[in-house]
Amino acid sequence: GMRIPSAIQLHKASKTLTLRYGEDSYDLPAEFLRVHSPSAEVQGHGNPVLQYGKLNVGLVGVEPAGQYALKLSFDDGHDSGLFTWDYLYELATRKDQLWADYLAELASAGKSRDPDESVVKLML
């Protein structure tokens, strides 16, 4: 069945979404959620579009979308991502691995988490 959290807390100041499943609690940073948003723009119709420069992004809204998902709104204007319960559980339980993968993708693409910084790749 669907893994629905027993509690959901949005901490705007720390830019964190906390999901509780029974005894287990997971803190998901807004940046992590933003770069893993399942929306059409981000997924690019089948080919995921690498999101970068989202270091400072915050969460401004969390609302249920029907019985099956959460709609997350971010302060960069992105609000079309519907995070299903199953996907949220995957993000929560696999956060460390997914984040490491994301950082590796950023590095190989020469992109930065910081929107004010561009990475100069030296071809030595």
Tell me the role of every PLM-derived stretch.
Residues 1-124:
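Motif-centric detector for short Cys/His coordination patterns
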